[in-house]
Amino acid sequence: MLRRFSLFSLGFLGWLLVSGNASASFSSTLSEGYHTLSNNVAQTWNEPEHYDLYVPAITWHARFAYDKEKTDKYNERPWGAGFGVSRWDEKGNWHGLYLMAFKDSFNKWEPIGGYGWEKTWRPLTDQNFHLGLGYTLGVTARDNWNYIPIPVILPLASIGYGPATFQMTYIPGTYNNGNVYFAWARFQF
């Protein structure tokens, strides 16, 4: 019995030590991530290479996730515009700060602003062609939620040539809510 208790105690103590190290490691990872993010946002704001025009192009409600009666009523032409600043870092990745307003699914104005980052690849010998995958962190507000600010973390993907980029995201959701593909053109000046 004493032997089992000793083995259990040693195992529990080892678990506490490992979980303490994992917790410290997780905390330091979060801290490093926050510092990297805040430094990238500050550098993009203070040292922009480009001014960007955003032109919303399409919203598409995933038909498998909606009743037809709902999608028949939704607006899928998000008229609007936006403005931003951006830069390419030393690794060739894209960073941007943006503010955009567009007509949402109910044809009401929806503003969104935030920071976007994309890992960028240039797979062809023509370095003007680029592909990107990343994320955006921002805040939006919707009419059907009384324009209460709502934080968003969404994936980003893009395909572009030179200063013109077609950028997109997917808003996940539940049945008859969310599950929207949203895309826009971004022009760098």
Curated annotation (Swiss-Prot):
Give the range the annotation lists for the signal sequence. 1-24
GO biological process terms, alphabetically, are: lipid A biosynthetic process
Job of this protein: Transfers a fatty acid residue from the sn-1 position of a phospholipid to the N-linked hydroxyfatty acid chain on the proximal unit of lipid A or its precursors.
Top-rank taxon: Bacteria
**Name under which the protein is recorded:** Lipid A acyltransferase PagP
The record's similarity note reads: Belongs to the lipid A palmitoyltransferase family.
Which Gene Ontology MF annotations are present?
A: acyltransferase activity
**In terms of one coarse class, where is the protein primarily found?**
membrane
What Pfam families does its record include?
PagP (PF07017)
InterPro entries, per this entry?
A: LipidA_acyl_PagP, OMP/PagP_b-brl
Q: Which UniProt keywords apply?
A: Acyltransferase, Cell outer membrane, Membrane, Signal, Transferase
Active site feature? 61, 104-105
| Catalyzed reactions per annotation | a lipid A + a 1,2-diacyl-sn-glycero-3-phosphocholine = a hepta-acyl lipid A + a 2-acyl-sn-glycero-3-phosphocholine; a lipid IVA + a 1,2-diacyl-sn-glycero-3-phosphocholine = a lipid IVB + a 2-acyl-sn-glycero-3-phosphocholine; a lipid IIA + a 1,2-diacyl-sn-glycero-3-phosphocholine = a lipid IIB + a 2-acyl-sn-glycero-3-phosphocholine
**Compartment annotation:** Cell outer membrane
| Group of enzyme by EC | transferase
Q: Which GO terms describe its cellular component?
A: cell outer membrane
Q: How does it assemble?
A: Homodimer.
